[in-house]
A protein has these predicted regions:
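Mid-to-C-terminal functional-domain signal that highlights helix-capping/loop sites
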Residues: 1-178
Length: 178
């Protein structure tokens, strides 16, 4: 209700919904116009990552890895978390029309603590479920069916970045390995 709507009347002649940097996130190319320090070579510079930093323990979760796993249960900064990934989000930096960009998906980090108990999660090919109750969860962290229906996971501050744009500020970042 308090959201703002973007206007197509920007005062510039650039077409709304178009990408002036086609192929910017092609992992075979260096970042266009980036003139900063080298980033750690753990990932291609323009790999899409979800970055989490809890208690000075930065971790990057590559979206291409998340697209295969859908769920990651992890511990960051002594806090148990879960990362949920869902397809359906286009890269704004791939094709000339943003809507036609490759599907990089969307990932969100949550605390896995619910009602004083830590849950672990899995993806069954269609849905997110917790191992403890079998409740079904959506990518927004809400239980939609089962014993925990209506419960909401607490979102953890996380940011979708290209690897170089995160690692330049947090070079000590651990890249998640399954």
């Amino acid at each position: 209700p308090a959201g703002l709507v973007l206007s197509r009347e920007t005062g510039f002649s650039r077409t709304y919904g178009s990408n002036p940097y086609v192929g910017y996130d092609d992992v075979n190319n260096p970042p266009f116009l980036y003139d900063g320090p080298e980033t750690p070579g753990q990932l291609p510079a323009v790999a899409h990552v979800l970055a989490v930093d809890i208690n000075d323990d930065p971790v990057a979760y590559p979206l291409d890895m998340l697209s295969e796993m859908h769920v990651v249960n992890d511990k960051v900064g002594d806090q148990d978390i879960v990362i949920l990934w869902k397809s359906g989000t286009a890269s704004a930096l791939d094709a000339s029309s943003i809507a036609e960009g490759k599907d990089v998906g969307a990932a969100i980090a949550y605390s896995s603590l619910v009602d004083g108990k830590y849950l672990t999660f899995k993806f069954d090919g269609l849905r997110f479920l917790d191992d403890q109750t079998g409740s079904i969860w959506n990518v927004l962290g809400r239980a939609t069916d089962g014993d925990l229906v209506g419960r909401q996971l607490e979102e953890i501050v996380s940011v979708n970045h290209l690897w170089f744009s995160w690692a330049v500020f947090k070079p000590e970042t651990r890249v998640y390995q399954p």
